[in-house]
């Protein structure tokens, strides 16, 4: 039996984008900082890293498709924060953003990591953006790095 898995190290020549929603920027800025930190710690070249900002989480799938379709990137780390409010808006935005991101990844068969927080309140989001529950931006970039490595291994 053979176990095939990705490694948590970049070769240094991977072109990566971090696609970040600006809405709830107090949270998403911290997620983005975590993702950048992870990228650099694991061998990424900052000159091969692009930060792409969109107004909100609903716009993430549209721009993700543009990035993947450009063929300029080896992978994309998607970050956002959708916080429940008093209306059903949260349900619509989180469902469509999640579905759109997954569909784009499958359509282009390219590594995409999902670092979009969906929380009930601001406190939960803060906990996941660098306090009690770690930094989910760092974790999303870590996932992308492993996916990039695994894809290289499977390519042979």
Curated annotation (Swiss-Prot):
Instruction: Return the EC number.
Output: 2.5.1.78
- Disulfide bridge partners, by residue number: none
| Signal peptide (from-to) | none
UniProt name for this protein? 6,7-dimethyl-8-ribityllumazine synthase
Q: Which residues form the active site?
A: 89
Positions binding 5-amino-6-(D-ribitylamino)uracil in this chain are 23, 57-59, 81-83, 114
| Known function | Catalyzes the formation of 6,7-dimethyl-8-ribityllumazine by condensation of 5-amino-6-(D-ribitylamino)uracil with 3,4-dihydroxy-2-butanone 4-phosphate. This is the penultimate step in the biosynthesis of riboflavin.
| Residues given in the record as (2S)-2-hydroxy-3-oxobutyl phosphate binding sites | 86-87, 128
GO cellular-component terms in the record? cytosol; riboflavin synthase complex
What is the gene name? ribH
The record's section on SUPFAM superfamilies has: Lumazine synthase
Q: Which domain of life is it from?
A: Bacteria
């Amino acid at each position: 039996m053979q176990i095939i898995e990705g490694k948590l190290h970049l070769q240094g020549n991977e072109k990566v984008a971090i696609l970040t929603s600006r809405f709830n920027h107090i949270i998403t800025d911290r997620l983005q900082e975590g993702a950048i930190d992870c990228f650099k710690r694991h061998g990424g070249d900052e000159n091969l890293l692009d930060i792409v900002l969109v107004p909100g989480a609903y716009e993430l799938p549209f721009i993700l498709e543009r990035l993947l379709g450009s063929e300029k990137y080896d992978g994309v780390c998607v970050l956002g924060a959708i916080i429940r409010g008093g209306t059903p808006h949260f349900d619509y935005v989180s469902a469509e953003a999640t579905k759109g991101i997954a569909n784009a990844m499958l359509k282009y068969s390219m590594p995409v990591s999902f670092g979009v927080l969906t929380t009930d309140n601001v406190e939960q989001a803060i906990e996941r953006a660098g306090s009690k529950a770690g930094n989910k931006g760092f974790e999303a970039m870590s996932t992308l790095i492993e996916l990039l490595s695994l894809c290289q291994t499977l390519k042979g």
